[in-house]
C-alpha cells in the first residue's frame, strides 16, 4: 500500500463513471499476486478471485494495514482457498494503532458507511499481541505490511521505527515472512534489519529502490516484489532495478486498488492485472514469460510456504 487510506480508492459512485479494466490474456503458466488489499476493492471477493484465475493468477495475498483490516484479511483467507493473508500495522497507521481503528469492510459492500462502535483504546502491547496471534494462523503467510514511510507524515519516524522493530521480532517468533513497506526510507530500513537480525524470509513490497539497492537486497537474500508502477512511462529507473534483480528473488503484485499497471492505468486495479506487470517484467529482463511465471511461483512458495 503506497500510503494510507487517504490514497485514491474507486468508490461505487465513481466506479460507474470509470471503464472497467481490460481483462489480460491468460498467462502461459500460473502465478500469484503477492500483495493486494481485497478489503479496499469494490467487488465481491469471489468475483475478484475468479477474474484473477482467468488471467492465470491463482493465488492472492491480501494484506492488513491496521488491526481491523488484519483481522479481516485473516478471516478472508480462512474463507477462500485461493487467498492468503498478511497482518501488521502499516507505518502510516502506527500512531493511530492504539485507537479504535477503521471498521472491517464487508466484501459484499466494502465501502458501506458505518459509525465505529465506542471502544476503549488498546495499548501498543495489546495490538502487537493480537497481530502475533493472527500471524500464527496457517492461512497467514507474512507479517506485513510493516516498515517505514518517510514520504508522508502520518506518524513520526521514531514511532514508525519502534513498531517496525516490534514487527521484525514477531516475524521471527512465528516463523513467517516479513513484508516491508519502504518509502523514501531505504537506508533506515536496511539498517534496522541488520541491527535486529532479519527473519529468514524478507519481502520488499512495491520495491522502489535503485540498482545499488537491488544488489544490497540480493546479497542479503531479500525478495523484491514489483508493482504496476514498473510499467509507467516515467519509471525507467525502476525497470533498470527490475532488470538487475535476480530472477529467483522477484515477485509481482498489484497493491490493488492502487498502482494500476499499463495498459489499464487510471482504471480500478485488481489482482488479475498482475499479469500485465509480469509481462512487463519478462520484457525488461529478457525472459520467456512462462519461465518468469515459474520463477515467481517458486519464489512465492519458498517465501510464503507451499500451497
Spans of features found by a protein language model:
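Mid-domain alpha/beta scaffold segments of enzyme catalytic cores
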Residues: 1-307
